[in-house]
């Protein structure tokens, strides 16, 4: 049983397969587990195991996702594969399965297709940092020149979406032949994984990032001062350190004079901890839910941004009718609803559309009525009367 051998002393990286329907994403995922299983680094997952992905719910949105784990000599991987295009859109936008990098699967028999482009754009918009290309079904193309042309086309496509098209590794594979155990194609899967090891950077750990905690509640403790509670999203905060309060009103600085967790006093709080932070010189009226406490200067408040948004279908509890430019919903950001306006939008392929239908994937420009601590890649929900009607990710900050 390979299960016993999984060690947790290797760095952990989250990846996934993306690309056009029927280009072999799931077959390739199965092939990776088949090849690595021979070295005791994975459990064999067959196409049917992966394809029958259970439904998951993330922020009320139903997504089908298969999770596979395996390891190489240097890393441990969690790999996500989605059966349908809509599942990818939802997955990448909600961040249900965060990806540190992705394997773009493109069939040599077809070349890049509509969803190949859409997935590259999505990867760019939601901030997937690195890609590796698996040129699949190469066993079905006899002419080496055709394969070279497809590779060139993919590289140009990647460059057009601001990925380093000339430098991204492109590996010729055949998922099917590798599963069937043909040595030449098994070696190609190993080559692919070596490329993934080498070119998908190791993610920075949450504790190593600059401190950020979204305020969930505020209390006043007589004789001691004001306490803000919440879950530390990233970084570390130590007693005596200066932090900045950002969002809703003008940013201001304060010093953390105490860190409490489960009624015990600590020297520091770190990413993942639910804590109360005692703040010097701050009145209860000065801070509120929706603000964030951060390492000074590490994040700034903004009102205007662009986002990639998935609009829920009626069956998912979304709207029953379309909306138009000028629509004013609430944007739920971290811990609070902020009213805003969707001033403009374009369709998934960048074309202009008059209205947005439930089930659409759009790029939109939003403007909030008050500034909120915002950064690229930040997730948000769009709500109307307390129910979620869309999920989004910030792709550009305007002002």
Curated annotation (Swiss-Prot):
Residue ranges annotated for the tr-type G domain, each copy included: 10-204
Gene Ontology cellular-component terms listed: cytosol
Keyword check for Nucleotidyltransferase: no
Species name: Synechococcus sp. (strain CC9311)
Sites where the protein binds Mg(2+): 26
Principal localisation: cytoplasm
Region span, G5: 174-176
Full protein name: Elongation factor Tu
HAMAP family: EF_Tu_B
SUPFAM superfamilies assigned: EF-Tu/eEF-1alpha/eIF2-gamma C-terminal domain (SSF50465), P-loop containing nucleoside triphosphate hydrolases (SSF52540), Translation proteins (SSF50447)
Region (G1): 19-26
Gene name in the database record: tuf
InterPro entries xref list: EF-Tu_GTP-bd, EF-Tu_GTPase, EFTu-like_2, EFTU_2, G_TR_CS, P-loop_NTPase, Small_GTP-bd, T_Tr_GTP-bd_dom
Pfam hit, one: GTP_EFTU_D2
């Amino acid at each position: 049983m390979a299960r016993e051998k999984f060690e947790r002393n290797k760095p952990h990286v989250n990846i996934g397969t993306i690309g056009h329907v029927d280009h072999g994403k799931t077959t390739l995922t199965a092939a990776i587990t088949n090849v690595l299983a021979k070295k005791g680094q994975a459990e064999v997952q067959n196409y049917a195991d992966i394809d029958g992905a259970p439904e998951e719910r993330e922020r009320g949105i139903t997504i089908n996702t298969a999770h596979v784990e395996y390891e190489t000599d240097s890393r441990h991987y969690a790999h996500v594969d989605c059966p349908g295009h809509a599942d990818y859109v939802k997955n990448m936008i909600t961040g249900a399965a965060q990806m540190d990098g992705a394997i773009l699967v493109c069939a040599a028999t077809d070349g890049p297709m509509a969803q190949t482009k859409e997935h590259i754009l999505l990867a760019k918009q939601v901030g997937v940092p690195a890609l590796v290309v698996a040129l699949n079904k190469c066993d079905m193309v006899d002419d080496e020149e055709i394969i070279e042309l497809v590779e060139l086309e993919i590289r140009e496509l990647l460059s057009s979406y601001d990925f380093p098209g000339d430098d991204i590794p492109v590996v010729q594979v055949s998922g099917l032949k590798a599963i069937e155990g043909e040595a030449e194609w098994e070696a190609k899967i190993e080559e692919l994984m070596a490329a993934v090891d080498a070119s998908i950077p190791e993610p920075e750990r949450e504790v190593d990032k600059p401190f950020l905690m979204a305020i969930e509640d505020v209390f006043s403790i007589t004789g001691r001062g004001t306490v803000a509670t919440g879950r530390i999203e990233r970084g570390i905060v130590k007693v005596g350190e200066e932090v900045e309060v950002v969002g809703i009103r003008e940013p201001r600085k304060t010093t953390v004079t105490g860190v409490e967790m489960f009624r015990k006093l600590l020297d520091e709080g770190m990413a993942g901890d639910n804590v109360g932070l005692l703040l010097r010189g701050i009145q209860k009226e000065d801070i509120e839910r929706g603000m964030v406490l951060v390492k000074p200067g590490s994040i700034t408040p903004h009102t205007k941004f662009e986002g990639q948004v998935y609009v829920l279908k009626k069956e998912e509890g979304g709207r029953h009718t379309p909306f138009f430019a000028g629509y004013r919903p609430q944007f739920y950001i971290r811990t609070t609803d902020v009213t805003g306006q969707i001033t403009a939008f374009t369709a998934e392929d960048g074309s202009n559309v008059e209205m947005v239908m439930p089930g659409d994937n759009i790029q939109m420009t939003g403007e909030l009525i008050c500034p909120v601590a915002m950064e690229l890649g930040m997730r948000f929900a769009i709500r109307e009367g307390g129910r979620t009607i869309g999920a989004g990710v910030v792709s550009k900050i305007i002002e």
